[in-house]
Design a protein with these regions (language model features):
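N-terminal subdomain of nucleotide-sugar transferases
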Residues: 1-61, 374, 381
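Conserved donor-binding/catalytic core segment of Leloir-type glycosyltransferases
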Residues: 4, 199-216, 222-225, 237
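Short His-centered aromatic/hydrophobic patch
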Residues: 110-115
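Carbohydrate-associated surface elements
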Residues: 167, 186
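Short alpha-helical donor nucleotide-sugar binding micro-motif in glycosyltransferases
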Residues: 266-267, 274-279
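Aromatic "clamp/platform" in nucleotide-sugar-dependent glycosyltransferases that forms part
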Residues: 287
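Short hydrophobic beta-strand element within catalytic cores of glycosyltransferases
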Residues: 304-307
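Conserved acidic donor-binding segment of nucleotide-sugar-dependent glycosyltransferases
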Residues: 319, 323-330, 339-345
Length: 381
């Protein structure tokens, strides 16, 4: 079976996290014997507008990656926008290169409605079976722009729409009257290769991972940690970066927590793996999620989890794996963190890892996706 992924990008040495979720899924399907290629778009700044080589081809672990540069012209250089081609034009030219080298795919699998909309020509002109996986947090807000609402027509052309959580599926049903099925995110096999290392000393380490954006709730997390009045042997490591870093730093200074709360910046998957192994509890303080893949990455290590009811974790996190709290509730989050420091040894790491593997491993989720492909292809004969 020849599958063409349509994505926001694919990881590279320079951009290690771009399209990482889609890359893990593509590799899992390739491991099942499918011929998987990826057609990806790379956002680039204005200086790339007149860059000649806008389409590239590379191979990663047996997967052909066809990428094109899409230039995002800033307001400062808006006079140059007349030289920009539509995103769909870039995808069309990239597909022509793929078509010349590999022929027509059996099925197209687009990730998020933005890229599905800009590759609808694959359905309308080539009549290719078309699957969409939605995991865009924006689609779980109930407050989408008119432009995004127009893009939602792509759902109606799809042979099957997949959502990564029930909350997101409900949102698509309520906002766009779209029926979908739920197939959760998968966790990379690399997270199962090593387990959490229990510390012999008296230190306790919380870890949180994510982009520094408002919806991730790191401001709430710092407030909760400060409210807990933890002794010096309890610390919090935060992995990530972004627009709200200064706000988080100001709160750390305000509460005089610089000795206990560390901002570690962006880390590679291997570095995240190692940090999780040397942590005692994962904390998700998000205001909004579609699933929260970082939670299952932590569970793959055997870590107990504290997570907010933010649209994803409440659908799979069970009481024997951790604690669910209401979002934006500083006291409830703080109380959960204090409880975890005292009772984290009550959680069975082996049981958490097994639950995670049985429900979210590459093998399990890839099998579910292959079943969707077969069902769609049988209807398109």
């Amino acid at each position: 079976m020849k599958v063409l992924f349509v994505t926001r990008g694919f990881p590279s040495e320079r951009e290690i996290m771009v399209g990482n979720y889609e890359a893990v899924q593509a590799k899992a399907l390739a491991a099942k014997g499918l011929d998987v290629s990826v057609m990806a778009m790379r956002w680039k700044p204005t200086r790339y507008l007149f860059f000649n080589n806008r389409i590239s081809h590379r191979e990663v672990d047996g997967i052909d990656i066809y990428e094109f540069i899409y230039v995002s012209v800033s307001e400062r250089f808006r006079f140059l926008r007349r030289f920009c081609s539509p995103m769909s034009h870039g995808f069309r030219k990239t597909f022509n290169k793929y078509l010349k080298e590999k022929g027509l795919p059996d099925i197209v699998h687009a990730h998020i409605v933005l890229y599905a909309y800009n590759t609808l020509f694959l359905k309308t002109e080539y009549n290719l079976p078309f699957v969409i996986t939605e995991h865009w947090t924006l689609m779980n807000t109930g407050n989408v722009s008119k432009e995004v609402e127009e893009m939602s027509i792509a759902y109606r052309f799809a042979d099957r729409v997949i959502c990564v959580s029930q909350a997101l599926a409900d949102s698509l049903k309520n906002n766009f009257q779209i029926n979908s099925i739920v197939i959760h995110n998968m966790v990379s096999d690399s997270f199962f290769k090593s387990a959490r290392i229990l510390s012999n000393d008296n230190h306790f380490t919380f870890i949180a991972i994510g982009a520094f954006r408002k919806n991730k709730g790191f401001d709430i997390l710092i407030d909760a940690f400060a409210n807990g009045r933890f002794p010096e042997n309890v610390c919090l490591n935060i992995v990530g970066d972004g627009e709200e870093r200064e706000l988080v730093e100001s709160k750390i200074r305000k509460y005089q927590l610089s000795n206990q709360v560390k901002l570690l910046g962006t880390k590679s998957p291997d570095e995240v793996n190692d940090l999780l192994c040397h942590s005692d509890c994962f904390v998700l303080s998000s205001r909004l999620e579609t699933f929260a893949i970082v939670v299952i990455e932590a569970m793959a290590k055997g870590l107990p989890v504290i997570a907010t009811r933010s649209g994803g974790p409440e659908t799979f996190l069970q009481h024997e794996h951790g604690i669910l709290v209401d979002k934006e509730n500083v006291k409830e989050l703080s109380d959960a963190m204090k409880y975890m420091v005292l009772h984290y040894t009550d959680y069975n790491s082996k049981q958490i890892r097994k639950y995670c593997y049985d429900h979210f491993s590459q093998d399990v989720i890839a099998n579910q996706i292959v079943c969707v492909y077969k069902e769609v292809l049988s209807r398109n004969k």
